[in-house]
Amino acid sequence: MLTFKNVTKVFYKGTPDEKVALDNVSFTVNDGEFVTIIGGNGSGKTTTLNILSGTISPDHGGVLLNNVDITNMSENKRAKYFARVFQDPQKGTAGNMQVIENLAIANRKGGKNGLGWYINKEQKQQFKEMLKGLNLGLENRLTTKTGVLSGGQRQALTLLMATLRAEPSHKQILKDYVTFSMGDKEIAREEVTKVYNEAHQEYIAKTKDLVLHQKMSAKDKHRTRLQYYKEFDEKIRKYDLTKQILLLDEHTAALDPKTARKVLELTEKIVRENKLTTLMITHNMKDAITYGDRLIMFYEGKIIHDIKGEEKKKLTVENLLHMFDEAENSLK
């Protein structure tokens, strides 16, 4: 669960150019929720994403992840929990590197070995399958420099990269589970430690029995040992609370209408399949209605409408235009 609590942000404070970007804004986004955000220029949309990602800090208020205050967490540490796609397709990829190299770096983001792009056969096949799902032919262009791809291909690749990250170590999973658990931290620590110890002891016992197995070949023992570890690993990864939150900052605005539609369809597919908590800024009212479970409307640094469920499904572009007109008239 993501909470934006009583956030105020003022730019150029105390000068003739003073601008209140956010005025005591609060909202909560539940796990797996897909929120579209609309509003005019300077209404506070991008400032909200900048504060969530840690690019800038609020003057007042804060950001909470599963009720844990991360307001003062640095941008690089917060990158484990937030992934962002910008309007410019060139921002999300390294143009002088190959498609597969870009994916490899994204796949190691936040990992203990840092950045790098060593790729084994298994990873290469995994990347090909991921790219195949984009239906853009990129699975056949693994060694192509991203700089020569079309804007749509590059943005689709950026979107895929944003959802990738290195699998956290077991130690990191246990630590984050305690940190971000909603209830009593000590109970959470005892619970996850018990699960880990029991699963690890079971894995050790199975591998010891495997060594004593006389009728099994070395190859079969190796294969079985890998299967035992996979079962152990899956038990621990059930406690991983750090699935990334996706921040989309007008990520189709620089694309032609046909390509933008394709990228939006891919966005919907990726978000739903991975159950990603997502906030998507758009100036396209039709897209704001079509996509997502919930719509938030900003005006002059405030949230003036927060629409979800059946109410959102019944929305029309005319409804949204009327809401904007009402907001403007209220200030006259």
Where are these regions (language model features)?
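A short, flexible loop at the N-terminus of ABC-type nucleotide-binding domains that lies
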Residues: 1, 10-24, 74
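The feature captures the beta-strand-to-loop junction immediately N-terminal to the Walker
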Residues: 38-40
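Helix-to-loop junction immediately C-terminal to a conserved catalytic motif
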Residues: 53
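Conserved ABC transporter NBD signature motif
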Residues: 61-68, 307
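ABC ATPase NBD coupling module
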Residues: 69-83, 91, 113-120, 124, ...
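Helical segment within the ABC ATPase nucleotide-binding domain
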Residues: 261-273
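H-loop/switch region of ABC-family ATPase nucleotide-binding domains
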Residues: 282-283
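Conserved beta-strand-loop-alpha-helix hinge in the C-terminal portion
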Residues: 302-325
